Amino acid sequence: MISNISITPIKTMFKNALNIHNFSFKSHTSTAIIGTNGAGKSTLINTILGIRSDYNFKVQNNNIPYHDNVIPQRKQLGVVSNLFNYPPGLNANDLFKFYQFFHKNCTPNLFEKNLLNKTYEHLSDGQKQRLKIDLALSHHPQLVIMDEPETSLEQNALIRLSNLISLRNTQQLTSIIATQI
């Protein structure tokens, strides 16, 4: 089970960014990381995910170094990141089927059913973002980490996203969200 994610700095890297001292994310709640552009939100998220190993932070999940236990727990993790894109030629339906191969209970919530056959590269930025959010949440992961999920979303999609996060809270699931809002 993914819980008790803690971050311990080995050395502070910047004067105004990522100045963190022994921080833990509380399980079964939503935590917002709020900051301006360049504050280090994405760097922190990528460090937690093990994507950035060049920053001097020690990230642990249940007192086990995060990079050592990502693979066994990947089915319990959902991620929304602008770093992730999908190969050309795949449509949303293909991507949901791919996710269903690993996660049997994969269900879309934000993505319009009439766009399922449209290829990823032909989706608008807002449609791509809704698809990324849906793929991250569709298997009901124990932990979802979202880096600026509000990017390119119109107001009604923002409201639906907020409702999905609230629903996760009632289900005692953990969400970590980096945002400027």
Sequence positions of predicted segments:
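Conserved ABC transporter NBD signature motif
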Residues: D54-Q73
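The feature captures the beta-strand-to-loop junction immediately N-terminal to the Walker
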Residues: I34-T36
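Helix N-cap at the start of a conserved alpha-helix in ABC-type nucleotide-binding domains
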Residues: Q155-A157
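ABC-family P-loop ATPase nucleotide-binding domains
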Residues: N82-H122, G126, L131
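A short, flexible loop at the N-terminus of ABC-type nucleotide-binding domains that lies
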Residues: M1-N22, S27, V70
